[in-house]
Amino acid sequence: MKLAKRVASLTPSATLAITEKAKELKAAGHDVIGLGAGEPDFNTPQHILDAAIKAMNEGHTKYTPSGGLPALKEEIIKKFARDQGLDYEPAEVIVCVGAKHALYTLFQVLLDEGDEVIIPTPYWVSYPEQVKLAGGVPVYVEGLEQNHFKITPEQLKQAITPRTKAVIINSPSNPTGMIYTAEELKALGEVCLAHGVLIVSDEIYEKLTYGGAKHVSIAELSPELKAQTVIINGVSKSHSMTGWRIGYAAGPKDIIKAMTDLASHSTSNPTSIAQYAAIAAYSGPQEPVEQMRQAFEQRLNIIYDKLVQIPGFTCVKPQGAFYLFPNAREAAAMAGCRTVDEFVAALLEEAKVALVPGSGFGAPDNVRLSYATSLDALETAVERIHRFMEARA
């Protein structure tokens, strides 16, 4: 059957593709270490699991309002006030089936055919695909490695055209782990305000920061920036709830209303049980969040030091999220590979280590390595990469 043109140009997720390949090799009996996962390796905290069981036992298994349970919206509003000093009303918040769905719904209600969305590179793999599905045009602005993968106000200004509708800011970043400072965000925000460009602020990794770095939301810097920003967030990364699929968006009422109307015709509502679990995530103890953050920071410090000792790898030390994003161009050449993609494929085939090629993130010289797995597995993986390089060099 002939499929719709809008899906013909879709690029499959690089992260999911490598994860599936690793699973296939494992199923065939190979000892594969997968470092492609974009999710914490910890279980969801117990008080959240208990809240979900309680909700089921109390019969909270029916439809909810399309925009989310009022009680969950209230907890999200309290979270914004507590963490960023931001004041939102229920009509300015929508609960979605994960942060990915919040982004998808936002672009569907925001973009007309040919509207442009500025996407800094390296980027999360789904940004350009979601923009294209909504009829939009991704416009890439390169975040240079020597600038810690951050874009400058001058770069942003040069990329804006009469068709520019929005810019995506992802801090802490997937895949690089970089974090914009308040001063850097303010400078980018001033450009957006001057040109009437909506800011889409993806803050899903906000709780995962290291080395004293702090997450700042661009919306908290001024009332004007708040009015021109849609924040995307969720409980997936902070509370190890990736499979529960609860994310949300907060922003101008007209945008949130349009998103809610669209959601009523697509998903009806996020899963009721997961919403009750998310209420417990935000209203309950936050110690598990900090414990996970500390574990990730310990892994980062150990594995970063080991990785940069491998010939051919250079890496900007990340300040957040749970990924390393080293430049592997020289390593690939030393291993006799023409491209980094070929290098990643050889690593999986010969060393049984699954990394994600940076080409899927708009950075073909890099690879993404997730440290959201056990320290033993990480150290073994780096040892295998080292041995692979020694054998190939």
UniProtKB/Swiss-Prot annotation:
Cofactor(s) this protein requires: pyridoxal 5'-phosphate
Entry's Gene Ontology molecular function annotations: L-aspartate:2-oxoglutarate aminotransferase activity; pyridoxal phosphate binding
Entry GO terms, CC: cytoplasm
Keyword Transferase included in the entry's annotation: yes
Subcellular location: Cytoplasm
Ligand binding (L-aspartate): 38, 124, 174
Modified residues (N6-(pyridoxal phosphate)lysine): 237
Pfam families, alphabetized: Aminotran_1_2
Predominant location: cytoplasm
Keyword Cytoplasm listed: yes
Catalytic activity: L-aspartate + 2-oxoglutarate = oxaloacetate + L-glutamate
UniProt keyword terms in alphabetical order: Aminotransferase, Cytoplasm, Pyridoxal phosphate, Transferase
Enzyme class of the recorded protein, top EC level: transferase
One annotated GO biological process: amino acid metabolic process
Tree of life domain: Bacteria
Enzyme Commission identifier(s): 2.6.1.1
Quaternary state and interactors: Homodimer.
Annotated PANTHER family: ASPARTATE AMINOTRANSFERASE (PTHR46383:SF1)
Family membership noted in the UniProt record: Belongs to the class-I pyridoxal-phosphate-dependent aminotransferase family.
Protein name, as recorded: Aspartate aminotransferase
Gene: aspC
